[in-house]
């Protein structure tokens, strides 16, 4: 994760921060950008907030306090849901506009991962939730060389016509 580049992109977009949230490893975008360990089941909610300026903050459940330990920033630990909400509100501070994996009217379903209840919760703090789609496009890992080799292998195995192969390889 390139924290300075993310923070610069947030400032350029006029966003106060980017709030990542996950439960049960549902947000593959967050997992890839933040390099989360998805081999261990996430049974509790966690949050990671990258402000446009300043130190990131993480909010994790007491049962899984290690969840975001590899990420920079201050760690807050919650147990009851009331504490989770009050710490989350405090973590967002004076933020007015925060990006999340949300897409208005589900226009980009690939990015529309955050559930409506979580969006409502963040809005209840007086924070506008905006789509992280542009940020995701900029910071999510793209195909590695190994993945490209797999795709080329698929093309070679599945297509017989050399013109079709050339066309598909040009797209890849």
Language model features with spans:
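Flexible, acidic/His-enriched mid-domain "rim/lid" segments that flank
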Residues: 1-4, 82-172
């Amino acid at each position: 994760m390139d924290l300075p580049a993310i923070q610069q992109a947030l400032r350029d977009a006029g966003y106060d921060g980017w709030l990542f949230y996950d439960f049960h490893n549902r947000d593959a975008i967050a997992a890839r950008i933040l390099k989360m360990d998805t081999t261990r089941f996430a049974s509790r909610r966690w949050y990671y907030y990258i402000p446009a300026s300043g130190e990131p903050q993480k909010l994790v459940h007491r049962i899984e306090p290690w969840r975001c330990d590899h990420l920079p920033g201050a760690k807050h630990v919650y147990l009851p849901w009331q504490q989770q909400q009050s710490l989350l509100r405090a973590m967002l501070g004076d933020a007015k506009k925060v990006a999340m994996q949300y897409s208005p009217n589900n226009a980009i379903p690939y990015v529309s991962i955050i559930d409506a209840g979580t969006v409502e919760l963040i809005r209840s703090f007086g924070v506008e939730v905006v789509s992280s789609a542009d940020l995701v496009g900029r910071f999510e890992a793209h195909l590695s060389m190994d993945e490209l080799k797999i795709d080329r292998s698929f093309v070679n195995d599945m297509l017989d016509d050399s013109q079709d192969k050339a066309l598909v390889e040009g797209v890849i």
